[in-house]
Amino acid sequence: MRSLPSLIAFLIVYLIIPPARAQSFYGSGVQEVRVEIPFKDWDYKLDSMKKANGEARILGTAWVNGLRFDSAGIRYKGNSSYFRTRNETYKKLPFNIKLDYKIKSQKMPEGQKTVKLSNAFLDPSFVRDPLAYEIIRQYMPAPLCNFTRYYVNNKYYGLYINTESIDENFLEKHFGTSEGYVIKCDPDNWKRVRSQTGCPKGENASLAYLNDNFGCYDAFYEVDDPGAWKYLLQLIKVLNKNTDKIETVLDVDQTLWMLALNNVLVNLDSYNGSLSHNYYLWVDTTGVCHPLIWDLNMAFGGWRRNFSFEEMKDDEIIQYQPLAEIDNNKRPLIAKLLRNSYYRKIYLAHFKTIVNDYLKSGKYLSRAQDMMREIDPWVKLDSLKLYGYDDFQNSLEKTMHTGPDHVIGIRQLMDKRTQWLLKHPLLNKVQPEISDVKHAPDASDIKITAKIVNATNGWLMYRSDRMFAFTRTRMYDDGTHGDATADDGLYTAKVAAEMAKHYYIAAEGSEGAATLPERASFEYFETKPAAKKKQ
């Protein structure tokens, strides 16, 4: 038997899987939002405000699932989803409702203060946003998203997509703090002009380096505080000029997940695509930037314009390459990171995990069908929807035509893409195998070991708190560095105990890479002392 002291000192490995945070307004079922606006010409007023100043609001009363919010601020939101919809004379426009606009104490029971309602622009299925967010939340922090019945002055304006804001409440929930800065890499006003003249052209929020003047970037990025510009420019300079130091300014693993998710789901209205937008950067208190995906109504091939703004053919999006844009210096997050052998192997491991979890298993399709069954009655009643009811019913299997665009059916795209990806040589590389992960105290340090085979390098990824990115340090199988026996496949690393509250293992082989847990860094191991025995 172990002695009592050793039992007390022993540390148990806990696998941490972030819990599904089902919240009433963002939970299952169709929600309800009502607003009362005291103007007959409220739509004209909102249009005028949107064109003059995208942030201006009119006052109204809002009811969210029956809860009343007085003096709420109401405005239209969106770029293409507003301007193109309005130009085509449709009345179903996207809304932003700020519940605490005048009464700062007002918020929903779960803490949210803003309601963001999208109009399913270029999505006859209505499910692209909620389905893509549901998938993404298994691998990185991302907003909750569901469906809402929306009424203005007691008139049913249709079924809307309801997406959680990336705000202080979101940051507290996922990172345990709202300190730091938030950078929106897609300003609400897409017509804004840079404050500095004589700048290089630039290309939206691509993180390409232009020069050291903040005024050359402020048409492409929107900051919540002027102090954020320093950290954005620091990221841009390191990414483009000193990539070896990128882990000091960027949560690289979360970035690799974002890039892989955009690619697998053919979400090209994103950083990966021709417009290079629709994401946020949260800058933590150490100056490290964490990317967050936003706006997924054109995932699953809904946006298919290439870098020449020509519409891509079906085969081009079905066979959208896993390493697309690796040679495109206008997308440095892709080009700079994926040209690094280690990062590329980890990216492909993440890519394969997503394919196996949601495409190969068919889970993406079953969830899409579940969602469509749930909302069917409300879509049918929606007289202002941007597509016909038949378009909704056929949107999984058939391509819908809307203006100059062809919106491919979700299943029509993803079933063929799944079969093509499963045969792709990049997803059939030999990967290392990781098992038998353990940790134990070693004086003021903690020693972490793992069995790794088919690997050339083992890495310990660790951090002291969930607000931080993981730090990488090498694990050894050489009989030194705390490793007992050389070349036995048991890799070891030691770090200061207070710095390794969370950790996971990464391994790199000659062909591929692997992590344990497989969904790391979103899932990870945690060190905790064993409970003491009662005397």
Model-predicted segments: where are they?
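Surface-exposed, short loops/turns at beta-strand junctions within beta-sandwich domains
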Residues: V495-A500
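Aromatic sugar-binding surface patches on proteins
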Residues: H481-K494
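Solvent-exposed serine/threonine-rich low-complexity stretches and specific carbohydrate-binding patches
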Residues: T471-G482
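Phosphate/dinucleotide-binding and metal-coordinating scaffold of catalytic cores
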Residues: A22-S444, V453-A469, G509-L516, F525-Q535
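Bacterial N-terminal signal peptides that target proteins for export
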Residues: M1-I8
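A short beta-strand segment in extracellular, disulfide-stabilized domains
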Residues: K447-T449
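Bacterial N-terminal signal peptides
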Residues: I8-L15
